[in-house]
């Protein structure tokens, strides 16, 4: 068994990747990276600098100072250039811009080394859309976490309502559907399960069941000589 393990978890928006990966990272004291957040970080920079030119953003992305920390409660905190930006990355405008940034081939290429080396020399678990297919095609374990559109929309709606936001589930469902279509059809690194990924459908699983299902896959990997 390699000293540094790299776990790739891919799947559509709302499947529970972040919750599951944070829990596993905390359990094993591994590094964790939400790869979608690094695109949000680039989007935040683009909005702040009012610069949306692909080459310029790619140059900035290649040198950006970004890290994730998971606290004792299992919550992830994002830091950009030493400043916590967790809440800013969740802004709706940042999210929409991130989707545009993620479709820029030069930006995706610039961020590849960052993702591949993240957390070294620690073992690491990464979640995203193309981790197992593009970022870590040689990952020690690949998981494709998915759920029905209805289940994902329901979870996202409850999450936002829990934060005091007034949202329509129909609108959330429509946005997720649009995001799915965009992620699956983009020319560069479209969302897809790696051929050797293990699929976990969380549609009818509770949060705890989803975490334990993935944790069992990780435990099986750790038991290998």
UniProtKB/Swiss-Prot annotation:
Single GO biological process annotation from the record? pyrimidine nucleotide metabolic process
Please identify the protein, giving its name as recorded: Cytidylate kinase
Tell me what reaction this enzyme catalyses.
CMP + ATP = CDP + ADP; dCMP + ATP = dCDP + ADP
Taken from the UniProt entry, a GO cellular component term is: cytoplasm
Which residues are recorded as binding ATP?
A: 11-19
Gene symbol here is cmk
Entry keywords, A to Z: ATP-binding, Cytoplasm, Kinase, Nucleotide-binding, Transferase
**What's the EC number here?**
2.7.4.25
Q: Where is the composition biased (Basic and acidic residues)?
A: 169-185
User: What are the leading ranks of the lineage?
Assistant: Bacteria, Pseudomonadati, Pseudomonadota, Alphaproteobacteria, Magnetococcales
- The species this protein belongs to is Magnetococcus marinus (strain ATCC BAA-1437 / JCM 17883 / MC-1)
Similarity remark: Belongs to the cytidylate kinase family. Type 1 subfamily.
Drop me one GO molecular function for this one: ATP binding
What does the UniProt entry say about where the protein is found? Cytoplasm
Give the superkingdom in one word.
Bacteria
């Amino acid at each position: 068994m390699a000293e540094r393990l790299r776990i790739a978890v891919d799947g559509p928006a709302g499947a529970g990747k972040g919750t599951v990966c944070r829990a596993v990272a905390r359990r094993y004291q591994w590094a964790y990276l939400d790869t979608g957040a690094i695109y949000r970080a680039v989007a935040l920079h683009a909005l702040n600098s009012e610069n949306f030119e692909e080459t310029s953003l790619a140059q900035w992305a290649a040198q950006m100072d970004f890290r994730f920390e998971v606290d004792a409660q299992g919550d992830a905190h994002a830091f950009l250039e030493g400043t916590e930006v967790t809440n800013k990355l969740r802004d709706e405008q940042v999210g929409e811009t991130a989707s545009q940034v993620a479709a820029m081939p030069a930006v995706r290429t610039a961020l590849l080394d960052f993702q591949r080396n993240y957390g070294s020399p620690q073992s690491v678990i990464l979640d995203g859309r193309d981790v197992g297919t593009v970022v870590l095609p040689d990952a020690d374990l690949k998981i494709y976490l998915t759920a029905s559109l209805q289940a994902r929309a329901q979870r996202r709606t409850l999450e936002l309502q829990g934060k005091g936001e007034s949202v329509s589930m129909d609108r959330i469902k429509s946005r997720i559907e649009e995001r799915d279509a965009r992620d699956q059809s983009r020319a560069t690194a479209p969302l897809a399960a790696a051929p050797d990924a293990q699929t976990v459908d969380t549609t009818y699983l509770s949060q705890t069941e989803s975490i334990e299902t993935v944790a069992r896959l990780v435990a099986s990997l750790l038991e290998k000589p």
